[in-house]
Amino acid sequence: MNKKKQRNSGVGLHPSKPSKNPRLRDSQSSMMVHSHYSRESEDSSEPAPSVELGGEEPLHEAFSCPVEDTGAASDLAGSPKELVPLPPSQNSVGKFVPQFAKPRKTVTRKAKAWEEDLEGCTTSQETRPELGALKAASQPQRESLRFPPHDIRPEVQTQPDGTLSKERTISLDNRSLGNNGFEMATVQDSSSPLSDAAAEGREADSRDPQERDAQGGEAGAQHSGEPQEGEDILYTSALAPASEPTWSVAQDLSVPTYTLSSTAAAPSSTSPADASLMDTVITEVSLDPSVLQQSAPQVAKLLGSLDEQIPDGGCIGTLLSSTPLAEETTAGREEARWEERCHGDTLASFTETEPEKQEPVTEAGDSGHIAQEMDPVVKTKDSGSDEQSPGDIGMLPLPAQSMNQMLVELRGLTCDQDLEGLSTPHTSSQLEHTCAASDPPQSTKDCHSSPGIPVHLAAPCPRDQAAWQESSAMELDFLPDSQIQDALDATNMEQGFPSGSMPDLGWPVPSSQSIGGSPKAVTKPQSRSHVETWAQETYRMQDATDTVRGLVVELSGLNRLIMSTHRDLEAFKRRKTKSLPYLTKGLGSLPRGDQSWRDL
């Protein structure tokens, strides 16, 4: 009986007096738990500071995340059903199974867990704009949480002087993308404090959402105007937080930077990354011909200030590449643009810029390479090609070194006296020495000519012919007596032409006046017809003497191998019939006729 009483009334769990009607007692307690939790969920949505449950412990505070509040409320609303499952059949009619649970203690435990979750929510997660008035102690933390974790720098959180670097960045926010597109944080020079509009944009985080939306739109309208003079406006594709002047762009080189305009003064920091950044700015501005004339003095000043500021000289080499562009803005824009982009089309750009500066035709024997070194506009005409008209310009692409040297020499000359200065004997002699040091050999230069111009081919050296005859005589000694030796005995087969019957190649003979340095004294080749040239090319294509000689050597080697194998086979057959006396002692088990491989 005692066990039944304890089971029905729950004396072991509740210290109170057992009720006479246990069904009514438990159903009332479950209904109280339901009403209790519904009251808690209603109180959680109201902005009340705290709620007391039965005088035990306070629940949660009002500023909590709305998403997590609903989730927690739904969990608490579902918890009593899991603890006390009371279907309608068991409430009204049916058997009753006593539930050994303490609803009051369970509610207290849930309230404690709820408070811990709310504290973790306010400290770890990002503050939403839909919340009301926030505490003043948590404002710096929420401002630091405004940036993504991977973009937060220590300079962003602690800035004692309140100054920012000289760049404008776009702060991407989830809420600002939906409302007003982009929210720009304005940044002035490194010596100026934070502007009023930026301060208002920072204070807008602690206000209600409507005021923040209105002020955010005004700040975006103020910053979307034209940039002022003396500023570099850099728009970064990823979020780049504002920082001190010593941070600059060097610590985050992975962010792609797009320069929109640059008429600025010297940069505020002295790091090499800023120098390279200004180098790209100078290059982009100088490539635009409309901005080139206006920003030339400023670019020159900027280059001078950068030379003074950069101590290590890491980026001076790249900045010097843009120096001729700033110097030649008034002389010619086309020359600067073609020199910057590609060196291959420099001759065409010179032809377009100076069409009226053309001198009479200069005769050139080896395709006029010396005349082109003197001036790219001088017309050249080959004496062997009579089909070309005097108006044609025979110009060949020069190597990169000769073009750079030519541009350096032509840079100091004006358009009026460049040809007169180059026509002096001193200048032409210098050019001849330069060509002798840097030009390829004669046969290489001749191959660059056009198909209409005859091609000079190197004549076979008599030393090579002597080596061929010696090698053939040496190989004939090793050949067996066969038809191959008879074929090689005819030495005339190895020479395509008999001795003295080779066509005249017409090598150029230098004149005596070329030593004096006159521009007209150019080497002239001896006159010869095109038939001889094409006959020589045909002879070169059809001459397969080396190939035939190689095949003969291979065949002779194979013949020697076959003959030696045949001799060994004959010797083996002869030895097989004989019996050697010294093999019978150690090899008595071997049958007659089977011998070891050493006897072969």
UniProtKB/Swiss-Prot annotation:
Chain positions covered by the region annotation Required for interaction with HSF2BP? 475-600
Q: Name one GO molecular function term.
A: damaged DNA binding
Residue numbers spanned by region Required for nuclear location = 1-150
Q: Which GO terms describe its cellular component?
A: chromosome; site of double-strand break
Database matches in Pfam families: Brme1
Describe the disruption phenotype.
Male mutants are infertile. They have smaller-than-normal testes with reduced diameters of seminiferous tubules and sperm density. Female mutants exhibit normal fertility with no apparent defect in adult ovaries. They show a strong reduction of the follicle pool.
The alphabetized UniProt keywords are: Chromosome, Meiosis, Phosphoprotein
Basic and acidic residues biased stretches: 143-154, 199-215, 330-344
Which residues does the annotated region (Disordered) include?
1-98, 117-239, 315-394, 432-451
Q: Where in the cell is it found?
A: Chromosome
Q: In which tissues is it expressed?
A: Expressed in testis.
One example of a Gene Ontology biological process annotation: reciprocal meiotic recombination
The answer, when asked if Coiled coil is one of the entry's keywords, is no
| Residues modified to Phosphoserine | 79, 191-192, 195
Q: Which InterPro entries match?
A: Brme1 (IPR031441)
* Phosphoprotein recorded as keyword: yes
Q: How does it assemble?
A: Interacts with HSF2BP (via N-terminus) and BRCA2; the interaction with HSF2BP is direct and allows the formation of a ternary complex. The complex BRME1:HSF2BP:BRCA2 interacts with SPATA22, MEIOB and RAD51.
Q: What does this protein do?
A: Meiotic recombination factor component of recombination bridges involved in meiotic double-strand break repair. Modulates the localization of recombinases DMC1:RAD51 to meiotic double-strand break (DSB) sites through the interaction with and stabilization of the BRCA2:HSF2BP complex during meiotic recombination. Indispensable for the DSB repair, homologous synapsis, and crossover formation that are needed for progression past metaphase I, is essential for spermatogenesis and male fertility.
Q: What is this protein called?
A: Break repair meiotic recombinase recruitment factor 1
**Species name:** Mus musculus
